[in-house]
Design a protein with these regions (language model features):
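Hydrophobic alpha-helical interaction segments
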Residues: 1-127
Length: 127
């Protein structure tokens, strides 16, 4: 959306849209590690708004988003039923956490997601 202040107009985004943008195009955010570090600092997210943004996108985005939500479930108060809904949207696979990565050193079974490093290492990127 556009917001004006003192005659200046600036484009702003929601936390949820930022998550979708970062997980869709990590190359525009300094890479997947930087993207995950940045978005994991959000104090909270609106899971319903995020679900709505992801619902008309790819199953791979649903898998990446579901994986992130599962890891941040306690901090962001994400309920198991929300994770189940993302899992239903993430049909098919396997998918890649970083679609540009040539490496696949880790695997998330629930999300059928290839990780660029072992899962324990990737989880360290989440702050």
């Amino acid at each position: 959306s556009m917001r004006g202040r003192g005659g200046l107009r600036t484009t702003v985004t929601t936390r949820e849209q930022t998550i979708v943008d970062c997980l869709s195009h990590p190359d525009r955010c300094g890479g997947i590690e930087e993207a995950l570090m940045s978005i994991s600092l959000f104090p909270y997210v609106d899971a319903e708004a995020l679900k709505e943004l992801v619902s008309d996108k790819s199953a791979s985005l649903a898998a990446r988003t579901g994986w992130l939500l599962e890891r941040k479930a306690n901090k962001w108060r994400i309920t198991p039923d929300v994770l189940d809904e993302f899992e239903k949207m993430a049909k098919g696979g396997p998918f890649k956490l970083d679609k540009d990565s040539t490496e696949s050193r880790g695997w998330s079974r629930r999300w059928r997601l290839c990780l660029p490093e072992k899962e324990e290492e990737v989880e360290k990127w989440l702050l």
